[in-house]
Amino acid sequence: MHQRALLFSAFWTAVQAQQAGTLTAETHPSLTWQKCAAGGTCTEQKGSVVLDSNWRWLHSVDGSTNCYTGNTWDATLCPDNESCASNCALDGADYEGTYGVTTSGDALTLQFVTGANIGSRLYLMADDDESYQTFNLLNNEFTFDVDASKLPCGLNGAVYFVSMDADGGVAKYSTNKAGAKYGTGYCDSQCPRDLKFINGQANVEGWEPSDSDKNAGVGGHGSCCPEMDIWEANSISTAYTPHPCDDTAQTMCEGDTCGGTYSSERYAGTCDPDGCDFNAYRMGNESFYGPSKLVDSSSPVTVVTQFITADGTDSGALSEIKRFYVQGGKVIANAASNVDGVTGNSITADFCTAQKKAFGDDDIFAQHGGLQGMGNALSSMVLTLSIWDDHHSSMMWLDSSYPEDADATAPGVARGTCEPHAGDPEKVESQSGSATVTYSNIKYGPIGSTFDAPA
């Protein structure tokens, strides 16, 4: 996912300069959500959202000189990782004016392009306004409403969980003084190397500016952790996908050994970059999701995800990830697989094994722990809400046919109705900049507590 500007300040004064200078104060937009109890009683929680540090203005500690401009570091302020962390400070965010982020009650709206800014990624904050809200997903369910009607081919409105540190990495890394309050500490299963700071140090050493993304590049380090994609979607296609890693906590990786999207060898790292995805279209049910389909993406929909454990406890082994939709007052079960050799309408260990075999995919999911590995990470996850475009494969893996050179009629290749490269970033950024996604009515609680479950 694409980011803009990040700080892990090395001195207390760095963050103080940001807070006390003539720059923008950091005020988190409020966002309420509901915590539910068995039986369906839900209590409003007063939360907020924080913008990921990678989007923020990074400037000299004692002034306003850019440490990072476009996709290039300032050679004087950032000659190496350590010096850059000492010399550069993080600024607060004008959420609406600069980033197109607005909240109203329990609703969060993200605009794709606002001025020079492209996309955004935010995290739900705890009520202390200093740390990320964490969730134990085991034996619980997570529900939210989404309006993806304005997201065309090539855009992705994503709701997902990652194993970030709740404090943004402050306790582990003494040079990180900004912390969760400024959106630090991101990681995911791609072991992203486009992050400008990781583990309290800059990522300038080995940095290569992107040829296609005017704001991004790839550095010498990446940041890895398990990722549970609840909802990756536009108006054409949607998928939910667990991505396990060998470690349940955030770790830093080196160069191409990171694997994932940003490295020459995709499967070289300690995480599963592919995951075990359930995309109804890819599973042969082409009439399930989209405009005027069974789940009608032209209208808001409630998305329910349940994390079933083998023994029915909050510490049990993850055995199944179930999906329901609620729209027009009706509960809609997830689409059933229509692929030969693959049965079911939920993610289980058997489903994942059968799917990889049917599609001829390497079972990287199993190599990194499979469903059990994902379950091992679910006891403390941070909620991420974003909108982004894809400079690596134009989102074809979500809404078109992918791999691009594969036979589109072969099992697992077609993922949606978008034409190849309909989602090229240059095209969507110029033609669909006003696209928005709205997430609202977030609920979390025991199985069956956040919606009227079918008998």
From Swiss-Prot:
Glycans are attached at residues 81, 285. The keyword Hydrolase applies. It comes from the Eukaryota. GO terms for biological process: cellulose catabolic process. Coiled coil: none annotated. The active site is at residues 227, 232. Transmembrane segments: none annotated. Keywords: Carbohydrate metabolism, Cellulose degradation, Glycoprotein, Glycosidase, Hydrolase, Polysaccharide degradation, Secreted, Signal. GO terms for molecular function: cellulose 1,4-beta-cellobiosidase activity. It catalyses: Hydrolysis of (1->4)-beta-D-glucosidic linkages in cellulose and cellotetraose, releasing cellobiose from the non-reducing ends of the chains. GO terms for cellular component: extracellular region. Belongs to the glycosyl hydrolase 7 (cellulase C) family. PANTHER family: 1,4-BETA-D-GLUCAN CELLOBIOHYDROLASE A-RELATED (PTHR33753:SF6), 1,4-BETA-D-GLUCAN CELLOBIOHYDROLASE B (PTHR33753). The biological conversion of cellulose to glucose generally requires three types of hydrolytic enzymes: (1) Endoglucanases which cut internal beta-1,4-glucosidic bonds; (2) Exocellobiohydrolases that cut the disaccharide cellobiose from the non-reducing end of the cellulose polymer chain; (3) Beta-1,4-glucosidases which hydrolyze the cellobiose and other short cello-oligosaccharides to glucose. This is Probable 1,4-beta-D-glucan cellobiohydrolase A.
